Amino acid sequence: MKETNSFSQKLKQFALLFFPIFVTQMSLFAMSFFDTTMSGHASPIDLAGVAIGTSIWIPVSTGLTGILMATTPIVAQLVGSKKKEDVPHVVIQAVYLAICASFVVILIGLFTVTPILNGMRLEEPVERIAAQFLSIIAIGIIPLFTYTVLRGFIDALGKTRTTMIITLLSLPINVVLNYVLIFGNFGFPKLGGVGAAIASAATYWCILIITVMIIRTKEPFASFNIFKQLYRPSLSSWKEFLKLGVPIGFAIFFETSIFAAVTLMMSNFSTTTIAAHQAAMNFASLLYMTPLSLAMAMTIAVGFEVGAKRYNNAKQYGFIGIGLALAFALLYSILLYFFDDEIASIYTTDIQVHHLAKEFLIFAILFQISDAIATPVQGALRGYKDVNVALIMTLIAYWVIGLPLGYILATYTDWAAKGYWIGLIIGLAFGATFLLIRLFQVQRKYTTQNSRS
């Protein structure tokens, strides 16, 4: 990152931040995408089992990686304020937290996964695949969480192209392992959805190994000497980190778990409905990688400018990110409307699943505008280290408004499973409105301070 003077310079620098992040997020998502699509072509039961497994795994993993994402704004502000010498201590303490969090998640999972799945009253084959999926994916928790911290450090320096290269190097491993293990090619046993979990866990370890090697040997990362000194664990540092990270993590958890909760509630419907819902939700999540990538770029850009006390520049980056997100939302809405049949065909050859997935995809169009506002706005707020109000807003929008309304519509109207999608859409719209108002308040506060000084 460097200081910019004109709007065009900011737009160019933001694009250079965003594009590698976008490729990285798409590549990471591609692992889940290939898990879902390839499992779906194995059988509808495998697709449903992976759907249930990921609906439990994704909120946990994204919520905790969200906590660890606090590395990015902290390091970005340190670099912006020319405090490079403080960076190694922050990163190592975050790595310690990541490892501790990994063991806690694994321990809790040992005692909770089976009761949760038993309580869902799934068909026996679906429950078995979901349980095996979760047991195996746990092997990849430690590398995934540790990589999240190290990626936050790399991205905070504005070197988002590096994380892009790391992920692109790892993606082919995931695809090949999926092909071999899901379908039983080259003499390996046919494992179906369980093979997808093995492939993802192995890929997470590959990503971590590559990242550590780059940080140790390549500039500008090597000059920070991140691994030169293993600092003693510092509870005070953990407390400061968690003060920022926990609201970020829970805000992400509330947003992602609402979709997972809907998937779990879909267990009351048929396997066909679960599979169709998962297919449509998976593609909607694919499109979500764009506003998410814009949000991550905004955290870096806004955090850097706030650290340097250039608050007007930070405000301009906010407008750039939201504007780009709305433009992409329009493009994706057109794509969903005109190519719903082709999109559904990617996920399944089953006629009933295909038809129902097309109906769900139409609802995904309405997700686009809300995501284009809410997600980048949260990225900007993280750059300001303003996270507590966003946490409360997301809780209310998704869990107080969206999910209860969806349940009512699905249970007491003819909308059935589609009622959950309508509830999600309304919850997302409220969340986008609340968060945008908060961003304006924060920007006004900082620009007022700037004018007074």
From Swiss-Prot:
One of its GO terms (molecular function) is xenobiotic transmembrane transporter activity. The keyword Membrane applies. Belongs to the multi antimicrobial extrusion (MATE) (TC 2.A.66.1) family. It comes from the Bacteria. One of its GO terms (cellular component) is plasma membrane. Pfam families: MatE. Multidrug efflux pump. The keyword Cell division does not apply. Keywords: Antiport, Cell membrane, Ion transport, Membrane, Transmembrane, Transmembrane helix, Transport. InterPro entries: MATE_fam, MATE_MdtK, MdtK-like. Its main location: membrane. It is found in: Cell membrane. GO terms for biological process: monoatomic ion transport. The gene is norM. This is Probable multidrug resistance protein NorM. It is a multi-pass membrane protein. CDD domains: MATE_NorM_like. The chain crosses the membrane at residues 13-34, 49-71, 92-114, 129-151, 164-183, 193-215, 244-266, 286-308, 317-339, 359-381, 388-410, 420-442.
